[in-house]
Regions:
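Aromatic-rich carbohydrate-recognition surfaces in CAZymes
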Residues: 36-40, 44-136, 155-158, 162, ...
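CBM-like carbohydrate-recognition segments
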Residues: 32, 230-240, 246-330
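Low-complexity, Ser/Thr/Pro/Gly-enriched N-terminal "stalk/linker" regions
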Residues: 1-38, 49-73, 124, 172-175, ...
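Extended ligand-binding clefts on enzyme/binding-domain cores
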Residues: 4, 12, 89-90, 113, ...
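Amphipathic alpha-helical elements of HEAT/ARM-like alpha-solenoid repeat scaffolds that form extended
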Residues: 95-99, 197-205, 245, 299
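Acidic/His metal-coordination segments adjacent to aromatic residues that form catalytic metal sites
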Residues: 70-85, 141-151, 184, 223-224, ...
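Structural helix-adjacent loops and short alpha-helical linkers that scaffold large soluble proteins
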Residues: 1-11, 47-61, 99-127, 166-178, ...
């Protein structure tokens, strides 16, 4: 399916995102008023793809307004007030992804032309402050609060940081990969059961073994339904499935990417909106919500699929495929 067909098909998802944006620009999780800054940025990528520039820049301005002087943003907002008073290291840097996506779609939307001087300085500060989260081996602590930095690094959060850094600077992050198992999940919690910990290193171009990717995918992929959030749970989630589609495309697993994406189309409801997840043993949608960021992930995956089909000369209109081109050239 080409992008124009997908664009029409997922118009309700885009409208759902816009309907949950406040006048200040915050994009809520759903109609209950919670806002996660990373999810907010994911929604901005989708709005850029749809060229909804008024809503896009309103969301960008909200983000910069809520950055503190240290280039950090609170981990969660409820009804536009901070509700979690710590900072997660991958949140603020992710704003570069929608900014670059906008520039790729329309050069007139180049953030270097549109952001104010103050905002551009804040953007640089985000990445300077990020160094304070980094340990001597190049691994990032996942959070900071009033007591200091968390003595733990998380795979998914770190890979999101790597994505942001590579999108901004077009250079691979330097870290001691031999210390991977020692550095990640130092709290003793095994997070390998989560599909995000499996596919995010591939999404970020840190891992590139296709055989290993497909073998690990078997632990999470339920044919005909999608990708599970947690290996042992009978629960497929639409955002994880969509992100896994992009991860597969980045490493040229086009057939499995299309298969997974086709699987999840059955979950688009009568209003054209996707739920967060589906518990297939109980045959219920769970949780009972239609999250904006889930619908954004579907849009991003559809866009990536459309332009992957057209080859590398056209793939630079999608920020993730643009990164794929960078991975392949290095």
């Amino acid at each position: 399916m080409n992008w124009l067909d997908y664009k029409k098909k997922f118009e309700p998802s885009k409208k759902w995102i816009i309907s949950n944006q406040s006048s200040s620009g915050a994009i809520f999780w759903d109609e209950k008023g919670k806002c996660d800054p990373w999810d907010h940025c994911e929604c901005l990528i989708a709005l850029a793809i749809y060229e909804e520039w008024e809503h896009f820049w309103r969301g960008v301005n909200w983000f910069f307004t809520n950055l503190n002087e240290d280039g950090l943003i609170y981990a969660e907002f409820q009804n536009e007030k901070p509700s979690k008073l710590h900072y997660e290291s991958h949140h603020a840097p992710y704003i570069i992804m929608p900014l670059i996506q906008a520039s790729l779609i329309d050069e007139e939307q180049d953030y270097n032309k549109i952001l104010t001087n103050e905002q551009l300085l804040k953007l640089e500060n985000i990445f300077e402050v990020l160094n304070d989260f980094k340990d001597e081996d190049g691994y990032f602590y996942w959070a900071k609060d009033s007591n200091g930095y968390s003595d733990n690094s998380l795979i998914t959060a770190s890979m999101s940081i790597f994505l942001s850094l590579m999108a901004k600077d077009k250079s691979f992050p330097k870290f001691n990969i031999e210390m991977w198992h020692e550095k990640f999940n130092r709290d003793g919690v095994d997070r390998s059961r989560f599909s995000m910990d499996f596919y995010y290193p591939y999404l970020a171009g840190i891992k590139n073994n296709n055989k290993e990717f497909l073998e690990l995918l078997d632990n999470y992929y339920v044919k005909g339904l999608g990708v599970k959030c947690v290996a042992e749970e009978p629960w497929v989630t639409i955002a994880e499935s969509s992100e896994c589609v992009i991860s597969a495309l980045i490493h040229d697993n086009e057939n499995i990417a299309k298969q997974i994406f086709n699987d999840i189309q059955q979950f688009q409801n009568k209003d054209g909106i996707f739920p967060t997840g589906y518990q297939y043993d109980m045959e219920i949608f769970w949780p009972e919500e239609n999250s904006t960021w889930t619908n954004a992930a579907v849009i991003i995956a559809a866009h990536a699929l459309s332009f992957y089909d057209l080859g590398s000369n056209n793939s630079s209109v999608n920020v993730f495929l643009e990164l794929r081109n960078f991975f392949n050239s290095n």
